[in-house]
Amino acid sequence: MTPMQEPHSPVQGSHFDIAPIAAEMRGEAGYEHSGHTARALVRESDLRVMLLVMKAGSVIKEHSAKETASVYTVSGHLRVRLPTGVVDVPSGRLLVLERGLVHSVEAVEESSFLLSRGSHEKP
């Protein structure tokens, strides 16, 4: 998937080779300027999956989401700051955040991770 492509629809099933996409993203201007960038892999009304890449030492400032979210570290090591403390999320680990939870994300080392969010609508 290139930067100009739309996110995939899961109608027929979607699969992604994450490493080359992340490598491509590290060449983007946003990555060079802010230390991180994101790309939508899937954008549906009930599910969004984003791939994010971060330079070591970069931070995504404190924020919250309307939806329950999961963070799966594909490579590297993330440190997530929550109101209750700090959670380390190294490669291969999954962190689930309840909706509305204020948090920030720091890349302890160069990292890539998948952010998945469900619908903010209650069933």
Language-model segment annotations:
Residues M1-D46, R81:
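A short, N-terminal "cap"/entry segment at the start of jelly-roll beta-barrel domains
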Residues H77-R79, V86, V102, S112:
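Structural motif
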Residues V53-K55, S64-R79:
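Short, conserved beta-strand element in jelly-roll/cupin
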Residues H33-G35, R48-A65, R99:
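Conserved short histidine dyad/triad with adjacent acidic residue
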Residues R99-P123:
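Ligand-binding loop in jelly-roll beta-barrel domains
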Residues T84-R99:
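Short acidic-glycine-tyrosine-enriched beta hairpin
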Residues V74-S75, P90-S91, E109:
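A cytosolic small-molecule/anion-sensing beta-strand core signal
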Residues I60-E62, V80-R81, L97, V102-V108:
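Short beta-strand His + acidic residue motifs that chelate non-heme Fe in jelly-roll/DSBH
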